[in-house]
Amino acid sequence: MDQSMKPLLSPTERPRRHLTASVISFFLPNQFRLSTILCIGALLQTILCAVLPLRYAAVPCVTVLLISVLTTIQECFQPNTNSFMADVIRGRTTAQIPGKDGTHGREPGKGSVVVFHLGIQYNHPLGVFAPHMREISNRFLAMQQDILRRKDELGLLAVQNWRGSERDSGNTTLIKYFFKDVESIHKFAHEPLHKETWTYYNQHHPGHVGIFHETFITKDGGYESMYVNCHPILLGRGEVKVNNRKDGTEEWVGTLVSADTPGLKSFKARLGRDD
């Protein structure tokens, strides 16, 4: 039986684009307390009632609510219209780093992975609208866009944004980077955009803005993952630029393979260790 690992996603000519939340939907909801949002809605409805006849003033609110209810009913009874299932891969999958030739081979857990957490906290009543936050956020965004354009050069496997929920304010934003090796993260740390961001931060010393990072380094047999009925996430979003073995053309190969492959069914097996 062929126990070699096969990628679940077809190779692509360019890095795959995944569904992402808009900047507004990612940041804005947590900038206001629920009571504030309700009060804003009540104020807008009051204004409509003051300038329009009652039977017309209720139309916007009722329309939005009706669309939401009907959409939910449709997605529940017609699964093919369920937007929440977009890009979901059914079954058990795991992330394995492909080799330079684009194949995953037979040996799990091969290759090193460096996980780098880079985050920012905005400890201010104005949240992302606080002093210096616009400039710092723009610099973070510029770094993100630059590293995505140069994924192969900088050894980036995957990146994903997260928002912390340890506080009601949701004022912590975390960027999770997955690099191929230590050399890759060193290269990223010495990039001009990274240095310029630190220079700006150190010059202005905004006490209400916190910046943090964490680094985790793994070697062969030091990483393992399991995703069940998930869209590509975390290291499962990883991609490596390789040369096609048949015609030598460049392509991007993903990390996701089936976890039901005989050699990947257990925790130890996915680490490349004997049971």
UniProtKB/Swiss-Prot annotation:
Record carries keyword Transmembrane helix: no
InterPro entries (alphabetical): Monooxy_af470
Enzyme class: oxidoreductase
GO biological process per UniProt: fumagillin biosynthetic process; terpenoid biosynthetic process
Catalysed reactions, as listed in the record: prefumagillin + NADPH + 2 O2 = fumagillin + acetaldehyde + NADP(+) + H2O
EC number(s) stated in the UniProt entry for this protein: 1.13.1.-
Pathway assignment: Secondary metabolite biosynthesis; terpenoid biosynthesis
A Pfam family that the UniProt record links to this protein: Monooxy_af470-like
Keywords for this protein: Monooxygenase, Oxidoreductase
Known uses: Fumagillin and its derivatives have been intensely studied for their potential use in the treatment of amebiasis, microsporidiosis and rheumatoid arthritis. They have also interesting antiangiogenic properties by the irreversible inhibition of human type 2 methionine aminopeptidase (METAP2).
Induction comment from the UniProt entry of this chain: Expression is controlled by the fumagillin biosynthesis cluster regulator fumR. Expression is also under the control of the developmental and secondary metabolism regulator veA.
Effect of a null allele: Completely abolishes the production of fumagillin but leads to the accumulation of the intermediate prefumagillin.
Superkingdom of this protein's organism: Eukaryota
Gene Ontology molecular function, alphabetical: monooxygenase activity
Biological function: Monooxygenase; part of the gene cluster that mediates the biosynthesis of fumagillin, a meroterpenoid that has numerous biological activities including irreversible inhibition of human type 2 methionine aminopeptidase (METAP2). Within the pathway, the monooxygenase af470 catalyzes the oxidative cleavage of prefumagillin to yield the final compound of the pathway, fumagillin. The pathway begins with the conversion of farnesyl pyrophosphate (FPP) to beta-trans-bergamotene by the membrane-bound beta-trans-bergamotene synthase af520.
Protein known as: Monooxygenase af470
